[in-house]
């Protein structure tokens, strides 16, 4: 059947990939039913890292974030991202905790740019890269909560292909935005043709339930607001008094002239637009300045001052004119002097409309300049500060960039996932922002040298960089307040420029005018703000070794040398979809799935073992006996003794595979 929607195709799209060597980005094509691809690895828990929180000090100010409870339910894994994702989605204990529970996924995958990085093997052929990413995206989709989102960080090499791949996996209707990050702070002199300044971050929702948090308002956002009239509602700014009209064939009811009470001029909304408010709402404000009434319709003037044709002008929409033009000017001036103006107000020559600060922040914008979220050079400085001048990555990401992503896509206590940990920036920022996190790293050298040490520093408050602290805010320090429209940042810049201009003129420095200007623009910086004080913890884990392999020369599935003891038990349990029973509780059986109990025998399954196991179960329970060798008659004996039970021969009954097609 022909596909009914647009899809990206590539070489071997119907195949799967397995690593050719543990701990590297090298892959081999295999059939999707090959046990080397299908095997579910478990997580082997190593040590648990516990941090400590630094008490508060009078030396600093503290943000609300500094008081968040440090999260301790975090997971740091050494292992290949695909195998880790399979463990998180397939191992019952992990699936229960993470499937459908992850609020935000951020990945900064290998860009496939054919560059040679010290910590990344990034030169993956396009079809391999697409297959690698497709399989991982399908697992990530299972992990995402219904209101979650995925953020994929890319450069020019694979961005266009990844967009189509994300459409295929998540649905094009769930596309949210393509965010553009200005990663460079200067042009590259070694660029061959163009110095690329940006990366892109593709964001997709898990479903229509996904909601993006709004951005907190900054001092710059609020700088345009003032209160020149003593408005009882607080600060405001003069916004556009006109609105675009979508009525093209006839006159909009709010397209008419208003006579100005002071100048007497007939004023119209902007061409192609209408007044922002309806007639009654406008009159409610205008009548505070002078009395208004409906006037005649001047067709010629209306055509000249709007985008209307004469045949579109409506005679039933009159202009608003002054009842007593002679007294209107004085009445209007008096009302202006009284202050606390209405929402549609009169100025000396025109009209204005008040707009108040929104109660909540503003929507995130898709352009992220480096002065807001940092750049590559800033990120490298953060790494150098943590690791004695080392530069382990060519393109690290600044903490401020991850801070914005995590703020927009999650809330404190939510789970954040990154399966390409690198230096651990995502987990570090998530911890500092009160989120739970799961991250994994493929390369053991990166894991032991950078990822884990960095996260340990974060927990022990030994990482003062990144988003840990914020410079104190620049605030007004004048006696009478800064002039309207002048922010503390504006005043500080003015003072800096003024000092440069007069630095070589001692007399000018002493002048009354300069001293007056400095006094009128005086600012100060508040205490440095601490956003993170350490604390929390994380579990360290690594992937279990493979227990199942395929021998092409024999064309059969084999058990590996690692398939022994508890490793074998846990592998069989996971691959059969059972949940482990705790070995310390002296259970006879190893695992349970509903009413079925699993026993793994590394050796021969006999009728005597079956009889013994049957004596240990309760009515209604069944037995799954997995053994490396099964004696004749054992299967029939178990089925007869305990209905619904079965024997699993290892490895053949777990993975039936043959390149000849007998699967």
Label each PLM-derived region with a short phrase.
Residues 86-149, 157, 173, 198-200, ...:
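SAM-dependent methyltransferase catalytic-core segment centered on the flexible catalytic loop
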Residues 207-384, 388:
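Active-site-adjacent helix-turn-beta-strand microarchitecture at beta-sheet edges
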Residues 3-10, 20, 126-130, 147, ...:
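Conserved S-adenosyl-L-methionine
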Residues 84-92, 105, 110, 136, ...:
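Generic, well-ordered alpha-helical scaffold segments in large soluble proteins
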Residues 441-663:
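PRPP-dependent phosphoribosyltransferase catalytic core
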Residues 146-147, 157-220:
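Signature of N6-adenine DNA methyltransferases within the class I
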Residues 75-76, 377-415:
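Glycine-rich adenosyl-nucleotide cofactor-binding module
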């Amino acid at each position: 059947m022909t596909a009914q929607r647009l899809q990206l195709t590539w070489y071997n799209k119907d195949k799967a990939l397995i690593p050719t060597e543990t701990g590297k980005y090298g892959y081999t094509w295999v059939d999707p039913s090959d046990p080397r691809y299908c095997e579910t690895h478990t997580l082997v828990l190593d040590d648990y890292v516990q941090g400590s929180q630094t008490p508060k000090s009078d030396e600093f100010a503290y943000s609300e974030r500094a008081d968040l409870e440090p999260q301790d339910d975090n997971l740091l894994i050494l292992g290949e991202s695909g195998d880790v994702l399979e463990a998180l989605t397939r191992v019952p204990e992990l699936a229960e905790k993470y499937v459908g529970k992850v609020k935000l996924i951020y990945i900064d995958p290998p860009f496939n740019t054919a560059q040679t990085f010290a910590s990344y093997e990034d030169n993956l052929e396009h079809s391999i890269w697409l297959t690698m990413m497709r399989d991982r995206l399908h697992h990530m989709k299972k992990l995402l909560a219904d209101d979650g989102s995925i953020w994929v960080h890319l450069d020019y090499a694979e961005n266009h292909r990844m967009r189509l791949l994300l459409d295929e996996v998540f649905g094009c209707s769930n596309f949210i935005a393509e965010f553009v990050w200005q990663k460079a702070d200067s042009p590259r002199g070694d660029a061959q043709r163009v110095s690329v300044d940006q990366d892109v971050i593709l964001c997709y929702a898990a479903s229509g339930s996904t909601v993006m948090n709004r951005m907190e308002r900054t001092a710059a956002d609020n700088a345009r607001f003032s209160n020149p009239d003593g408005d009882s509602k607080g600060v405001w700014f003069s916004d556009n008094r006109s609105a675009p009209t979508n009525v093209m064939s006839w006159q909009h009811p709010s397209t008419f002239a208003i006579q100005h009470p002071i100048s007497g001029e007939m004023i119209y909304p902007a061409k192609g637009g209408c007044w922002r408010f309806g007639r009654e709402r406008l009159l409610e404000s205008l009548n505070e300045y002078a009395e208004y009434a409906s006037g005649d319709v001047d067709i010629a003037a209306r055509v000249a001052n709007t985008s209307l044709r004469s045949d579109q002008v409506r005679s039933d929409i009159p202009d608003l004119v002054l009842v007593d033009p002679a007294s209107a000017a004085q009445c209007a001036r008096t009302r202006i002097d009284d202050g606390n103006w209405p929402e549609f107000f009169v100025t000396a020559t025109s009209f204005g409309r008040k707009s108040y600060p929104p109660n909540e922040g503003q929507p995130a914008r898709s352009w992220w300049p480096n002065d807001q979220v940092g750049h590559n050079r800033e990120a490298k400085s953060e790494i150098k500060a943590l690791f004695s001048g080392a530069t382990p990555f060519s393109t690290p990401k600044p903490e401020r960039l991850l801070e914005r992503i995590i703020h927009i896509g999650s809330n404190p206590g939510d789970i954040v996932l990154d399966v390409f940990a690198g230096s651990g920036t995502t987990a570090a920022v998530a911890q500092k922002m009160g989120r739970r996190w799961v991250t994994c790293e493929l390369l053991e050298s990166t894991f032991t040298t950078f990822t884990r040490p960095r996260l340990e520093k974060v927990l022990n408050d030994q990482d003062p960089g990144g988003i840990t602290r914020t410079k104190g805010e620049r605030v007004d320090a004048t006696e009478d307040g800064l002039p309207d429209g002048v922010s503390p940042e504006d005043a500080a810049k003015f003072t800096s420029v003024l000092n440069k201009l007069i630095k070589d003129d001692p007399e000018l420095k002493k002048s009354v005018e300069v001293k007056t200007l400095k006094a009128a623009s005086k600012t100060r910086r508040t205490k440095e703000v601490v956003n993170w004080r350490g604390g929390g913890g994380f579990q360290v884990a690594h992937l279990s070794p493979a227990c199942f392999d395929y021998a092409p020369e024999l064309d059969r599935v084999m058990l590996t040398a690692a398939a022994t003891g508890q490793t074998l038990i846990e592998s069989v349990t996971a691959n059969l979809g059972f949940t482990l029973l705790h070995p310390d509780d002296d259970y006879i059986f190893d695992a349970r799935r509903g009413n079925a109990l699993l026993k793994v025998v590394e050796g021969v399954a006999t009728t005597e073992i079956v009889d013994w196991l049957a004596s240990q179960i309760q009515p209604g329970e069944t037995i799954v006996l997995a053994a490396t060798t099964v004696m004749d008659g054992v299967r029939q004996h178990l089925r007869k003794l305990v209905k619904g039970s079965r024997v699993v021969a290892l490895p053949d009954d777990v993975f039936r595979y043959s390149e000849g097609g007998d699967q």
